[in-house]
Amino acid sequence: MKKPNIVFVFGDQWRAQATGYAGNPTVKTPHLDRFATESINLTQAVSGYPVCSPARASLLTGQFPLTHGVFVNDVHLDNSAVSIAQAFKQGGYQTSYIGKWHVDGHGRSNYIPPERRQGFADWKVLECTHNYNQSAYYSGNSDQKLFWDGYDAIDQTKAAEDY
């Protein structure tokens, strides 16, 4: 049996109510609407710590901030923390992370070396930015800063589709 593709979408400042599939008649999200019908959709999930870095560290490790130690933004998630990427790799999956990382804690625009990527193999990432148009990122193991062509979310989605 072929293993299913598993895709997580971590949105910043994005409420579920801001989608068509959740019933908002004003917001048009046809691709997300279709994605939601073909996916597991957690409609009653909450964050135990609704701050970017702690929430991302929890999503990556399955641990509460008290365990993984990331209590505020811009704090490094310990390299020894077992991540979802490592678990999927053990299950025979290839892993990719595209977009905002925000658990490195070594500067918002600095290159993140492989040993601080929690096991993700494919990589198109910037630690953190709030510029969503033509922002910088690093790809693979290169420390050369690249730039998305247009609106980041569109280019990042294309990169995920290409992967």
What is the predicted function of each stretch?
Residues M1-Y163:
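Formylglycine-dependent sulfatase
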